[in-house]
Amino acid sequence: METNDLGFVASLMFILVPAIFLIVLYIGTQNNEA
């Protein structure tokens, strides 16, 4: 379970970090256009 949890957290961060970055970029461009 420990290795599974560690891998799950690593995968989650690997997916969430770029996703949040893209969301922030998208919101930033929307605000600039409006």
UniProtKB/Swiss-Prot annotation:
GO terms for biological process: photosynthesis, light reaction. GO terms for cellular component: photosystem II; plasma membrane-derived thylakoid membrane. It is found in: Cellular thylakoid membrane. It is a single-pass membrane protein. Keywords: Membrane, Photosynthesis, Photosystem II, Reaction center, Thylakoid, Transmembrane, Transmembrane helix. Its main location: membrane. The chain crosses the membrane at residues 7-27. Pfam families: PsbM (PF05151). It comes from the Bacteria. InterPro entries: PSII_PsbM, PSII_PsbM_sf. Belongs to the PsbM family. One of the components of the core complex of photosystem II (PSII). PSII is a light-driven water:plastoquinone oxidoreductase that uses light energy to abstract electrons from H(2)O, generating O(2) and a proton gradient subsequently used for ATP formation. It consists of a core antenna complex that captures photons, and an electron transfer chain that converts photonic excitation into a charge separation. This subunit is found at the monomer-monomer interface. PSII is composed of 1 copy each of membrane proteins PsbA, PsbB, PsbC, PsbD, PsbE, PsbF, PsbH, PsbI, PsbJ, PsbK, PsbL, PsbM, PsbT, PsbX, PsbY, PsbZ, Psb30/Ycf12, peripheral proteins PsbO, CyanoQ (PsbQ), PsbU, PsbV and a large number of cofactors. It forms dimeric complexes. HAMAP family: PSII_PsbM (MF_00438). This is Photosystem II reaction center protein M. It comes from Synechococcus sp. (strain CC9605). The gene is psbM.
